Amino acid sequence: MLGINNEDCFNTIQKIQDQGRKVGLVLTSPPYNTGRNSTDIKRRDTHEARYDIHLDNMTDSEYLDWTTALFHGFDNILRKNGVVLYNMSYGTDTTNTKEDYKPNEIMYKVINRVITETAFTIADTIVWKKSTALPNNTSKNKLTRLCEFVYVFVRKSELKSFETAKKVKSVAKTGQKFYENVYNFVEARNNDRTNKLNKATFSSELVLKLLDMYYTKGVVYDPFMGTGSTGVACEMLGIKWLGSEISTAQCEYARKRLEEL
């Protein structure tokens, strides 16, 4: 099962569970459900289409239920003291004119749902400063977005024992350990390369920095592999990895990237 699996992540998670396997770290960026995509063919052919086949337009209720099920799946396959690194951001869709449309709320609703209805809580929040800002030229009151967030989820029962890659810097005579400073601020490129298949990818540079902070052992799993940035970074470090991706075209794109390494 290692490598890219061209299937829904829930199928992959079930297979991992059925085989009695565990992953050491989950690192991913899910669809944000910003509603930019549409079943309208004219809209799908514009810049608003973020993915080649996924319609990023669930209702908030559907998206929250979907996220809850996803984290229940993570709980079933993540090893003891493992970590979930979950990149999310708020919406920027200004094309939706419905009065009740509030794109900024969904990220916080997701966090609330995860910490109240699953085994996980937030241990840390990493600010990812991108090299290129995302403009808001069509908005008179929204600021230009330069950062996204990576939420560090761990099991509530493991909040004091979950593992990071922080190294011991010194040990006092009393036995007290002092660790190196690892800051919750990361600067990395937006993505590795632009493509029409997925306009919401993160860069392998970001993945490399996150792995340096949190990877300790085991297989890294990305349930939304996209064009392969997580796999590329893991290959560069000699780390075993596993990914799921529903788009056949994106899987082929990722495999070609990996062959170029």
For the regions a protein language model found, what residue spans apply to each?
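Core catalytic lobe of class I
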Residues: M1-Y253
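Short, conserved SAM-binding/catalytic segment
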Residues: R255-L261
